[in-house]
Amino acid sequence: MKKLFALLILSGIGAQAFAHPADSARIKSLNADTAKIRTVQRSLPSPLPDPPFPTSDWDGAPLIGSDATAPNYPLTKLLGLSNSRLKIYGWIDPGADISSSKNSNAPTSYDLIPNTVMLDQVGIKFDLQPNTVQTDHVSFGFLSTTIFGTDYRYTTGKGYFSNQLLGNNNKYGFDPAEMYGLIYFPKIADGMLLKIGRYISPADIEAQWATDNYLYSHSLMFTVDPYTFTGAQATFKLGSYWQLEVGVDAGNDMAPWSKSAQINGLLMARWVSHDNNNSIYGGINALGNGDYTRQHDDLQMLVATWGHKFNKTFHMMTEAYYLWQYHALVGGTVITGPPQPFYTNVGAGAPIPGTMTAVGAVNYFQILVSKRDYISIRNGYLSDPQGGRTGYATSYSDHTIGFVHYFNDYIRIRPEIRYERAYADGITPYDNGTKKDQYTAGMDLIVRF
């Protein structure tokens, strides 16, 4: 037995001594690959150039592991904050259009008043982002965004100076649309970011701020879904390619102290491919009682977004959702203020028995022309069978082609042409209920400061 044991030892030593160098190299390579697999990448290379596109990453922010610190815009530099984590900056966004409608472009949003020049948005941000790249210590941050302009009416939340819209139907107003704190915990999962306060609804390709959108106008499906939530949202990084979001809030577009507020939950997941050329982001954006309460929506929402990069020149993003709520009124949340020429759909609509539903879908197709230019083609669809979202029981489509040009890192223009129409017989939603379809040619100018 001792001789056999000695023979086995000598055989092992001999095999090691006479092993082919290529075998040793393969073993080392295998070990290196295994170590690489076990290492979580904090962030992947961004799939898109920004500028000219409004973002360099797919939908589903915040992205843990990426540096979210804002660039040093002119106001930040003027205030001597270039070397600080705190950034103070903003933008101004006037726009104009030529429309086949005379008084109102509704249900189109963010381009409401036809054949005139208007101040869509002036925004100001106070922005301090936590450091989620590191994995050593807890990090804190916050974000505050306030806007003034005609676009306030879309982000207005009941209980946040909302009488400007809900009580008066004002043309211009302001809204503190984002006010939240951030806490980053590096040791929970592969990093967890907790957001507490008022924040943008995480779903959607399109965004509330002019600076964050491919085009000047918005799709009809974006117009009628949730804009902001107030509550808490936790984002978990799970490896290199997954994130999970869990949240609780007071319902879409209302403060917790509003008498319409109801508890809603959120559960969303984000996946990207290993080359970051594909992304899927979706789940439950809002789920609760879903009871329309005290003349205000409580929208429930299932949503999914797919981003795909064909090559350096072409990419697209596609989104679809299903909305529902109970005991709603035609037209949704009630504006009790006086009718204005640009928006006459005020007062309580007729009750909708049972469940109100809506289905939306949109596709964005982008063509990179140069480092400062791109073309965006958008095709959207909205089904509003009971009129709970637009005030008219019909389905719609909207079709837009836009060209975006950056003069420099701070100034861009976004001209576009658009056609949209309703399909139900005898239904005329456009120009205050007088037309079945609408043509517009519009443009805005974004100046960052």
Regions from the language model: what does each represent?
Residues K3-L4, Y199, N379:
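Hydrophobic alpha-helical segments, especially transmembrane helices
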Residues P52-P54, P74-L75, V133-H137, L143, ...:
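Signature for the C-terminal beta-barrel architecture of outer-membrane proteins
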